[in-house]
Regions:
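Mg2+-dependent prenyl diphosphate-binding active-site environment of isoprenoid biosynthetic enzymes
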Residues: 2-226, 232-244
């Protein structure tokens, strides 16, 4: 029960809505997977998400003192412990996935959380602060920092179910849409609350345009859902509606 473990637990206990593991669960249930088959993927994605939030809040990154109404990990403890806690959560995620003996899951999450995904998006975010913003740059940052992990949430159950590569690719596209919508709505809320960060889509686009885009994405996502999960009862449509309409 080391100090580092306590720091890790502190960040995990401030987990918000747990939306990412919920999505894995809903898709997995629709594919008739049992809990033991997808539980580690649920935990792994939340570990990676928590690691990203710890590092995102650091002074050298977004420099946020609070996360969901509580002190950020580096403010509650210190920067060194926060960095180590984030590193430990990330490695723990891959430890869990490796136990499932499905290398495709490990491969996908490593791609989506590494330089081609989450970490790469954060690098672009930091590098863009001193540069002129445009839609293409912000879209790229949001796709990598946010949408990539949602890709894993949708694709993991299809990988576990040994579905075709075509279906896995479609599920990743579905996840990318959900993640993109999630970030657009986040940006809208930040803009309206005057908690406006530099990397915000509403700094280069209008709110009405982005909300309209979300509804177009919803139609595309529902079309993919019907192809991937035909005649399956699930809450994926409700989840996407919740993301768009959340306050």
């Amino acid at each position: 029960n080391t100090k580092l473990y306590k720091v890790m637990c502190y960040s995990m206990k401030n987990g918000g809505k747990r939306l990412r593991p919920i999505i894995i669960k809903e898709v997995a249930k629709s594919l008739s997977l049992n809990k033991n088959q997808f539980l580690k993927s649920m935990i792994a994605i939340e570990l990676v998400h928590s690691y990203s939030l710890i590092h995102d809040d650091l002074p050298c990154m977004d420099d946020d003192d609070y996360r969901r109404g509580r002190l950020s990990t580096h403010k509650k403890y210190d920067e060194a412990q926060a960095i180590l806690a984030g590193n430990s959560l990330l490695t723990m995620a891959f430890n869990l996935l490796a136990q499932d003996s499905n290398p495709s899951l490990v491969e996908l999450l490593s791609i989506l959380s590494g330089h081609e995904g989450l970490a790469g998006g954060q690098s672009l975010d930091v590098d863009t602060i001193e540069k002129k913003l445009n839609f293409k740059i912000i879209k790229k940052i949001h796709e990598q920092k946010t949408a990539r992990l949602f890709e894993f949430c949708l694709a993991a159950p299809f990988i576990i179910s040994n579905k075709s590569q075509k279906e896995i690719n479609m599920s990743r596209k579905y996840g990318k849409i959900i993640g993109t919508v999630f970030q657009i709505i986040d940006d809208v809320h930040e803009y309206e609350n005057k908690d406006n960060e530099y990397i915000n889509i509403l700094n280069v686009m209008t709110k009405d345009d982005e909300i309209e885009k979300c509804y177009r994405y919803e139609i595309e996502a529902n079309s993919l859902r019907e192809k991937l999960l035909p005649n399956k009862k699930n809450r994926m449509n409700d989840i996407l509606s919740f993301i768009i309409n959340r306050k």
